[in-house]
Curated annotation (Swiss-Prot):
Name of the protein in question: Probable metal-nicotianamine transporter YSL6
Membrane topology category: Multi-pass membrane protein
Keyword Mitochondrion on entry: no
More about this protein: Was also erroneously assigned to At3g27010.
Amino acid sequence: MGTEIPRSAEISEALLPPESEKTVTATEEHVPEWKEQITIRGLTVSALLGTLFCIITHKLNLTVGIIPSLNVAAGLLGFFFVKSWTGFLSKLGFTVKPFTKQENTVIQTCVVACYGLAFSGGFGSYLIAMDEKTYKLIGADYPGNHAEDVINPGLWWMIGFLFVVSFLGLFSLVPLRKVMVLDYKLTYPSGTATAMLINSFHTNTGAELAGNQVKCLGKYLSLSLIWSCFKWFFSGIGDACGFDNFPTLGLTLFKNTFYFDFSPTYIGCGLICPHIVNCSVLLGAIISWGILWPFVSQHAGDWYPADLGSNDFKGLYGYKVFIAIAIILGDGLYNLVKIIAVTVKELCSSRSRRLNLPIVTDGVDDSEASEILLVKKKRDEVFLKDRIPLEFAIAGYVGLAAISTATIPIIFPPLKWYFVLCSYFIAPALAFCNSYGTGLTDWSLASTYGKIGLFIIASVVGSDGGVIAGLAACGVMMSIVSTAADLMQDFKTGYLTLSSAKSMFVSQLVGTAMGCVIAPLTFWLFWTAFDIGDPNGPYKAPYAVIFREMAILGIEGFAELPKHCLALCYGFFIAALIVNLLRDITPPKISQFIPIPMAMAVPFYIGAYFAIDMFVGTVILFVWERINRKDAEDFAGAVASGLICGDGIWTIPSAILSILRINPPICMYFGPSSAR
């Protein structure tokens, strides 16, 4: 699993249509039937964009594990492709079906469902943690790390696994869609922001701005693609050449991974992610690679044997991995308890629900109030019109659970059928908690629920297959909880764009089916072409080691940690709890400057280089906002998406060249003058 950045997006006022325009749209426009909202052209565009975003997600997941939201890019590119296609056919004299915001919403839903499986499918976490390379990296003699707990990636079993686990979450909460969206009036900030964006595309003002945003995205996509191609020529053979190893801050800092590697992807991530996330990542890099690891290294020979390899868990590498795990678990545990507490409080107290739920209740005059009521009535009517039968949802969940319970033990023999069945009994409750929490805070804790399942099953199964059983259970739980929250988010988007709930559900099913095939295929491209899991290469797959170590930890405990490592882990675990608590109890003007522990944890294990890149992105955005905030709000997302997509597209020809054993012609290398 990667660290997924909260998916809320800031929408500038120019993107929001005037109130009168919204009222006319909501009360007078013709709303297509749900079948008309799902089109062949829309599904074709969804498949193309889903493939692109799966590649981007895999690249981020296998390199640093931080995945920003690509929802804005999905909506924007979906609008651009279909609008361009309809315009082209119209000029040729063909009669084309108008492109509606409902069709745009279906495309958005389908794309997000597709590339979401590249994240929740575990290709950078629990699935790849099972492979032989991760086993060898931890060490054959490491307690609890057994050779029989190895299952290497295989295209067909991965596709089969995704098909049997990815659909259950969609059926688990369908009966509660009215409760979550209409009764509790949960905001689902990302879903609301996406809906406002799509609504704006289909107004005259918004369409013009969207056209300019697409031009901007295309410009920076081209620049990023050209730059990535240029960099390839100097990257040589191995992992020590090229711009990716440019000692921009000097050779001393370069040894501690402090350098700028000219990556368009990470700069784009810095432009998309909030300033506090980027600054938290940089602070984590400074604490770990600037202070902590040099300090621990000074005690080599005392705290751990000095002659160990750089990837030996009995040495410095063990500190890096386990302290990162401690911070991640501390952050995840705090947020889990917080979300459950908020959920219970809001559900048990109607008074608290009325007062505290984040519902927009701005003061309006009588005429505006009547217009808002008309809009709400229309949305409610459309949302409730196409009913999804309760019997269908229950039958779907029970049927899929039965198939999954019979199939998963065949793929992962240590995970017995009764463990799978127990997971499916408790999954709907956890899916509800996660969906409700996402609606309130925009923060999905799917990975935290997955880690809980990992620890419990690994400890129960024990040393005889516990690692594989725990990792597989993590995947089962994560898939259900994640897709359920995504579906509710999409229902909120559909509600605000006057899209049918049935078309949202069907498009989520279609997108998930696409993802079950596209996500493994695009991962297989990386797996075949690149050295995935090499700790010294670009595709480190950092969370593979972390997840396997978590499973081993659930079985063996802390017996084999290096000296003082456990004490440091306790310290950072408690620090993560305290920092999160401070973020919640201090006033917003102070809490906005308190770092996020989860973001700080990522560079502890990976390195500081990507933190430099992301900080460059956030500095560019900060300066841009000071010079022209309006332009920054309108175009920063397009620039970032272009940088990320261009670099992602280059991955395809780069992988093909690697498969064909065509190496870059030049190795650009830097060393000290005294070495000559």
